[in-house]
Amino acid sequence: MMNRVEEEKGNELGEGHTFIYQKYIDYLEENKFVDYPRMVQLAVAALRKKSPAVTVLISRFHHILIDEYQDINLSQKQMIDGLLTKQSNMWVVGDDDQAIYGWRGSDISFLLNFEREYAFTERFTLTINYRSGDLIIGASSRLAKNLQSRFEKNFSGDRQVKGEIRF
């Protein structure tokens, strides 16, 4: 298994932050505490062993639903893959324009490559935003077009809004 600090720190932590994070990991281990990322890692390790108990557990999951798929990290992806069987049905929701957890190791490529990785995938793109009007949707769409890795899409709001946006 990958060193926890290396796996979770993402690409943006400097040496000072890495030192502090290592102290945090040491504290957890000394006190026999388990945080959420460690729970995921332990689940991945158990799933890889394929013990009879794990096999029975996995057989109970026929449908897997994942929200905010654009924000999963490598450990979470490994856990998801470990839960899948040939009979599994997986339904994910993700928005490549809203990937915000790169600082903690999330990887947008898992969403962008989803259709290549999982057979029989069908994508539905929701193009009408019922939360915001055309003014905000237009501005955010122009901004999102500058993102390096994203699906091409066109959005519209469900109502006309007058005004102006100032930065």
Report the location of each language-model feature.
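Residue-level detector of secondary-structure boundary/capping sites
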Residues: 12-16, 34, 71, 105, ...
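Residue-level signature of catalytic and energy-coupling elements of molecular machines
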Residues: 35, 67, 136
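Glutamine-centric residue-chemistry signal
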Residues: 25-28, 70, 76, 98
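Walker B catalytic acidic pair
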Residues: 60, 68, 95
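Conserved RecA-like helicase ATPase core segment
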Residues: 74-167
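A basic/glycine-biased coupling hinge at the interface between accessory DNA-binding modules
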Residues: 1-61, 88, 108, 164
